[in-house]
């Protein structure tokens, strides 16, 4: 079964991973989709994107939900509809190539999974302080640059406001890849917000989860 792993980043945050090793047709037969989702699926040109989309729905079903429980707000941010008048869990979604991932929590969270690719070094100066990867081997530079992108992307998913700039507004503290956690700040609109970050390597991917630090 392509369910890959469940990760407890804290007692409040659980991440679920699905490895998209099945064919698109096999996945499609296994999930129940509302008409809106089916139309969206058909509009996707890439089979990889279609499989990732279905992988997320497989994870929802693994967690006791269905596609019918998932909605998106006007900005495209996902949320789970409440069940039996309960306060719904917060959800964050990410996917990259082989993997689909969701995070469920009772508090605001942002999740990102990224494939480790050398080309990240070409764009890294656009979104990060390159001093963070000085004096590292090339392999470590690539891994850390991908991690920092994931940190910024995860925080952006929580805040999700127009005008936020990765290099100008989101700042991560110095960390080592072996730490698997760090802290970061969003400095935007004359406010400073602190975030805790957890990250880990999954095969040749980096998984990052952000949540507010109180």
Predicted feature residues:
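Core catalytic alpha/beta fold that binds nucleotide/phospho-ligands
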Residues: 1-214
